[in-house]
């Protein structure tokens, strides 16, 4: 990458991970207000999907051309369905069931082990280079996430296994998105995967007896639309843009920033305490990103 493209790539990922991290705060506020998690997730992504339509139409020269592009094949539909199933429905549903038996912090730590699985599977399925510094960086990043969230994680049980499943579901989606190509543009693919995932989650939610609360305050509507549009449409769209520009391993390494932003946003919005160990976690996250993005000496271009 040129310096300008590299800076744009980093800015895109920082914006995406900030929006991801802030979504935990918005979600926490709404869940504490009594909103069933799966109903909240489902309607969040219905609204988020609809919010992508103007962007898809603008990028592709019309809504029909964006959603049903020329040359569309059943293979494209299958890929969009798979990404929606794994990235929206799979990740969020597994995360919800994990948090029934483990803390939100433990579930978040397990979810954000995603980069290490992307790095390992990316080596197998994508041919991404996995040098020693990158491996060390990924491990340090996992430790940094644990510290940034307060180091709260206990033994491995059923809940932890489900939480790990959410990370693996995200990993599968990342690999599919990077390995395959469709006729859909970035925003059209974002629309379809969020819509498909939302429908699956809502079907499960209503089948299990969950319902939207009878009364919603203006403040809660504000938090819901923030969760649905900037924190979902924005973060997912920027995430796909970044994946298209960089390798899966390098892109996913920046996911370590999302829980750090969640901690910082919680401090300012929810007035949660921020300990010294959490600051140490942030420093380790920064170190991990530097290591994962470093190139071994033999791969660096020779100086002129």
Regions found by a protein language model. Name each.
Residues 76-82, 130-141, 160-163, 184-194:
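Cytoplasmic-side transmembrane-helix entry/capping segments in multi-pass membrane proteins
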Residues 30, 40, 44, 98, ...:
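Hydrophobic/aromatic residues within transmembrane alpha-helices
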Residues 52, 121, 130-150, 167, ...:
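Hydrophobic transmembrane alpha-helices of multi-pass small-molecule transport proteins
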Residues 5-10, 33-42, 70-77, 150-169, ...:
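Juxtamembrane helix-entry segments on the extracytoplasmic side of multipass membrane proteins
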Residues 43, 88, 92, 106-113, ...:
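Helix-helix packing/entry segments at the starts of transmembrane helices
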Residues 1-43, 48, 97, 152-179, ...:
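Glycine-/small-residue-enriched transmembrane alpha-helix faces in small-molecule transporters
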Residues 21, 25, 53, 84-89, ...:
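Hydrophobic/small/kink-forming positions within alpha-helical transmembrane segments
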Residues 19, 23-24, 53-111, 147, ...:
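Specific transmembrane alpha-helical segments of multi-pass solute transporters/efflux pumps
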